[in-house]
Design a protein with these regions (language model features):
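Long, contiguous binding/interaction regions
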Residues: 1-49, 53-91
Length: 91
């Protein structure tokens, strides 16, 4: 049985604290910026941005695999939410 070659995807995952979860890093940065002359900043949030390439048979398979990575390891689903951006890798 013939099987297509896997596709390569550029993956970007943004992991942020869920709404209502205290963000002490964000609060510290927000308080410090005015002292450095940067006023008008509010709602500062700190998170993680992960970028990698992934081989998968299809975009759906890649998205499912990345979501599983987020749920099991890359994010703490109790306090963090993840957003996945998936694109075919540039040659």
């Amino acid at each position: 049985m013939w099987k297509a070659d896997p596709m390569v995807f550029d993956v970007q995952v943004e992991v942020m604290l869920r709404e209502g979860i205290s963000d002490p890093q964000g609060a510290t940065i927000e308080r410090a910026l005015p002292a450095l002359g940067f006023g008008g900043v509010s709602d500062m949030a700190v998170g993680k941005n992960l970028r990698f390439q992934l081989e998968a048979d299809s975009e759906d398979a890649a998205r499912t695999q990345v979501q599983d990575m987020c749920d099991r390891f890359l994010a703490n689903p109790v306090i963090e939410a993840s957003r996945i951006n998936l694109m075919p890798a540039s040659a």
